[in-house]
Amino acid sequence: MFSHIMIGSNDITRSKKFYDALFAAMGAQPGTEDARGRLAYSHNGGRFMVTKPIDGKPASHANGGTIGFVMKDAAQAEAMHKAGVANGGRSIEDSPGVRPHGAYLAYLRDPDGHKLVGVAR
């Protein structure tokens, strides 16, 4: 459905540390940086990118927005969550676990405040 998802960051070096750890927990490679300083990650056929805003204004998170990553199982979702928290993210909402609809969800925010979730169905 999407070619990529791109989010803004106020500190690309901090974001690289955070997302490299997050994607490693998902079994993906570290991000690559292009000539413009944008980070790119590949996972399950999709691309996730991080950049400083092109307009030069501070990056901000989407109020009401969530970026969900497909996990192969609950253990991978838990590993993603732990890696994120250990690298500057913070756990949010309920603790990682199975929700009433049967999916295992692990919510956290990245260092810039973007809401992320690892989802194992």
Question: How would you label these PLM feature ranges?
Answer:
Residues 3-10, 59-83, 86-121:
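Vicinal oxygen chelate
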Residues 1-2, 121:
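Absolute protein N-terminus
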Residues 40, 56-59, 98:
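Short secondary-structure boundary/capping segments
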Residues 29-34, 38-42, 69-70, 80, ...:
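A structural feature recognizing the 12-helix transmembrane core of secondary solute carriers
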Residues 48-54, 103:
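Conserved, structured core segments of small domains
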Residues 15, 19, 77, 84:
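Hydrophobic pocket/interface hotspot
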Residues 7-48:
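Core segments of cupin and vicinal oxygen chelate
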